[in-house]
């Protein structure tokens, strides 16, 4: 069963959604093989015996695709993501152009379905050259809009490390008056990260548009012992 919503306010129109969209009432993963039910994030498997693994040094791209609404998004993927080992996308859309790009690159990929519209699935998507050993998702509904923001948790075998690398692709809660849901979402993912014994990558669109949000994120990152990865050269821009 799904929850159906129709856009009535200008705040929803800012999301670029027009018409009726549906929010699944359970977690679903979209893959090249089809839509499958989500699994329990508490029970990742052992990865030591995996036949293929990420190299010890690998490239990664993190990008909010804005539902493919901006010009030249495909050219951007070809330039910045096609040759990478890992690609963490937010606001991805399973339109034919995106699916063709994934097939052409022979990528392994999973998307945590936030909502659907017109047969297209939207949500965070993690793309890799190496098959994942485990993947699960955590959704957090926006308090005002009720559209989920998501964290996709993937475990990949890593050469020389029996625990593998845990990759968290996060699109953080954005539209709320305070920070309660934002903090709860980060705390839920932090609990999963604490249980992993190997290396961790936390990336995505954190929506740290206020000093308080940035402070809270930095606090959790410090508690986890993570270090910020600065691109070289650093060509990032703010919207």
Give residue spans per PLM region:
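Sec-exported extracytoplasmic/periplasmic mature domains
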Residues: 81-82, 103-104, 132, 194-198
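Structured beta-strand-rich core segments of catalytic domains in phosphoester-bond hydrolases
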Residues: 27-45, 86, 90-166, 170-172
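His/acidic metal-ligating clusters that form di-metal
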Residues: 157-168, 178-208, 212-215
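Active site of divalent-metal-dependent phosphoester/diester hydrolases
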Residues: 27, 108-128, 147, 179, ...
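Catalytic metal-binding/acid-base residues of hydrolase active sites
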Residues: 66, 93, 171-173, 206-207
